[in-house]
């Protein structure tokens, strides 16, 4: 897989020669320095950025062979994504934010959204706006939103990066527990090498390539 960006007349290669297979239910952590290509790789795997060369196959479907509408529907059904900065809509309540993937799919998912909030321990905060929630609570809402459609694959980009150590530990415990409980494949970008030891496999990304990949002992 290859991915580059243009800055003026210059082309900057961000990913090159990436070959990666992730087993169903595996928990993989992507580590490496800032600018190494971790987030770009995650975006590409999740169908958010098309590679110039290569393909991404999830559940036997070539993600980038699909047209825009089919690709959006596939991502909605098969992929959950958690952002570092939560990406909650400020004018929507917690439950309404969790409903967003269901709304895109044209379904009434209120009951499922409430169930997702209950799984992350926030059923009693369903009608609160993001500004009324702590950082840890906002990230829990983001996790509930990512899991509401029960996707087989979940991507998380520095999910604890904006949290203090206590909230970071609680959020990661929750995320790992929910993934294990549901058999969800989990791919996490993190700078925290200690955190990465909790996965099944740790991959080191350096200068756009996977320079090391090993099972966590």
Task: Enumerate the predicted regions with their spans.
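ABC family nucleotide-binding domain
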Residues: 1-205
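H-loop (His-switch) and adjacent beta-strand-loop-beta switch element
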Residues: 202-215
